[in-house]
């Protein structure tokens, strides 16, 4: 778990992580490889869902702008991924719902005002900036985004 989050944070793809596991097969043996894959599946990380393993990064439709009220934080499910969207007039931020600490999915219920708190280890984030404001030291993962035809799109 601890090495997985570090690998993903440093840019390793799901395919590269799986390749590394398989390369370790002669040393670790089948039982430990199966155990590691079970952990990956239990973590329910979108990158490791079978339909996403060989997918190339692409633009995904998040929502029409009129469904994202200014001054509010909206929780959306999009393309197999949960997102928090902050909109304040022309400022828009699109965040992955997974905590950067151990990739725990942060539910919508963890949002109080503009503060989002991970239920696992209580890392807290300011959704207006994405910065970690309590316990941890890494910001939320923010996705590149654009507005096209009055619709918010995000890239992953």
Indicate where each model-derived feature is located.
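Hydrophobic alpha-helical segments
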Residues: 1-58
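Short alpha-helical basic/polar micro-motif
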Residues: 5, 97, 116
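Hydrophobic/aromatic pocket-lining and membrane-interface residues
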Residues: 7, 121, 145
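Short glycine/serine/threonine/alanine-rich loop segments
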Residues: 12, 104, 123
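N-terminal pre-ligand scaffold of iron-sulfur
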Residues: 46-113, 126-127, 131, 141-156
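Ligand-binding loop in jelly-roll beta-barrel domains
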Residues: 138
